[in-house]
Amino acid sequence: MPPAERRGPRLLILPAADRCVGWTLRAANGRQLGAGVRTYRSEDELAEAVRELIIERAALRCTVGQSEGRLWVWTAHLPVRSTRPGAGEAVAVARSARGYLRRDQCQAAVEAFLTGLQWIGQELRRSGGRRPW
């Protein structure tokens, strides 16, 4: 099936302040599944961070909690890569794109995000490492 016919989640690159870029993951129906926490100086830097996120997705630790507005939100963290004692805590790499009224809705959004990452990873492999976004 040609890539143009595949329907699945898409990673979108978004312009940010100071000529930086960020990313968001959207479902095939356009619903936001999650967004990157930080911005990047270039699309190449962003692509490298996304590749690392896809490769390391099994190590992601997702936390669910309530925001100040009493909505449920999630954050995905990657562990710090260091053997030094006290090297720091896990690094936040993605977050929910919106707040949810119920905890179970938020947890389902985490699962949808992780499934979307898996899809993007499969597309990356199918494309031979070329950016599918």
Q: Where is each model-derived feature located?
A:
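A short, exposed loop/beta-hairpin motif centered on an aromatic-Gly-Thr core
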Residues: 31-43, 85-104
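Mixed-charge, glycine-accented linear interaction segment located at domain edges/termini
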Residues: 97-133
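A compositionally biased, intrinsically disordered/low-complexity signal enriched
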Residues: 33, 50-53, 93, 113
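Short, ordered coil/turn segments that flank beta-strands lining enzyme active or ligand-binding pockets
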Residues: 17, 28-29
